């Protein structure tokens, strides 16, 4: 068949088209525009059958193709050396973007992120000085808008951290299980607005404690374990009643996972998951977070219940206890400085592993980026990929929105 293409050279001879012309009669498919062009200026494209093309190639009438590319020249002065006798050259699998993408072992997507959000009772969104780009969000408006932005780029999981008024804090943290407290109210609001949003909650007393510790403090400064766990169970049940999908005990009290599982099941919340802070270290990387919630301990530190940063094998003990007590997800905190612990849990547990890229990690990247010492966006994405490579299935990160926008091709 033939079709007309306008503006062809008038001297074109269709009979010389690669030496081929279909023996059958041809058709000229003319458009109204082509009809106005003189026949002598039309190009007739003649197509032969596959067998005719093959016969032409066999006869030596090979269609033209681009020539072999010359080898790129080396810089002047480059020594001429014999090729190394290498059986394997790993660089061959890295020589092009397509090959690098094909052989990439670790991937990351917005679905891997859990977005930590700070909330407070006010209407204004208050910037957090030590965490550029993060705010204490008004629970009724700012929070809803931030969640909408995250969902637009594929982040559909959030974890809530409340700033509680000092007047509501107490030594026993009773506000933690107030069914009409800030967190339960916020959960109900978000579930009403976004029913499919996955809401994680923090289970610990430090935001509600007048002492700033994760548990009840005895007069001699000892953090009371079992009494604290009793309070945490009531807190988790209140969160589940409001609609929480995953409760996350970050307190590091012994036995709290099993107690929470029993309390939730007894109230009919068998479907609510537990993400245990399995290996939460007594780290110096938490400073900006405590500023955000005004939850610094009023005295002492948290070393009697959080793990020693020098310890590795202890994480296995915590992991086995949490598994046996019914944890659904195991979390390591902090993240990047503890990649070895993430890998340790990944290699020894079939459960999903979470990593928390904490406030100090976030602040360092932001500060260095602001000073133009690093490419903030590239370092941020590399740090998240490293957490995934180490074995984290999900990552709690304050960069969730920014990183998801990068993955979606949006500008910051």
Swiss-Prot record:
Task: Read off the lineage from the record.
Answer: Eukaryota, Viridiplantae, Streptophyta, Embryophyta, Tracheophyta
The listed locations are: Plastid, Chloroplast
**Keywords, alphabetical:** Allosteric enzyme, Chlorophyll biosynthesis, Chloroplast, Heme biosynthesis, Lyase, Magnesium, Metal-binding, Plastid, Porphyrin biosynthesis, Transit peptide
- What this chain does, per the record? Is committed to plant tetrapyrrole synthesis. Catalyzes an early step in the biosynthesis of tetrapyrroles. Binds two molecules of 5-aminolevulinate per subunit, each at a distinct site, and catalyzes their condensation to form porphobilinogen.
- Please state what the protein is called: Delta-aminolevulinic acid dehydratase, chloroplastic
The record's note on quaternary structure and interaction partners says: Homooctamer.
List its EC numbers.
Answer: 4.2.1.24
Stored Pfam families: ALAD
The pathway where this protein functions is: Porphyrin-containing compound metabolism; protoporphyrin-IX biosynthesis; coproporphyrinogen-III from 5-aminolevulinate: step 1/4
What protein family is recorded?
Answer: Belongs to the ALAD family.
Residues the record lists as binding Mg(2+): 318
Q: Does the keyword DNA-binding apply?
A: no
This entry's comment on the bound cofactor is:
Binds 2 magnesium ions per monomer. The first magnesium ion is required for catalysis. The second functions as allosteric activator.
Q: Name one GO cellular component term.
A: chloroplast
Give GO MF terms, alphabetically.
porphobilinogen synthase activity; zinc ion binding
Record's compositionally biased regions (Basic residues): 86-97
Transit peptide, residues from-to = 1-48
CDD domains in the cross-refs: ALAD_PBGS_aspartate_rich (cd04823)
Q: Which domain of life is it from?
A: Eukaryota
Quote the tissue specificity entry: Leaves and root nodules.
Which of this chain's residues are annotated to bind 5-aminolevulinate 1?
290, 302
List the SMART domains: ALAD (SM01004)
Q: Which PROSITE patterns match?
A: D_ALA_DEHYDRATASE
Broad EC category: lyase
Residues that, per the record, bind 5-aminolevulinate 2: 359, 398
Q: Name the catalytic site residues.
A: 280 (schiff-base intermediate with substrate), 333 (schiff-base intermediate with substrate)
Q: Which reaction does it catalyse?
A: 2 5-aminolevulinate = porphobilinogen + 2 H2O + H(+)
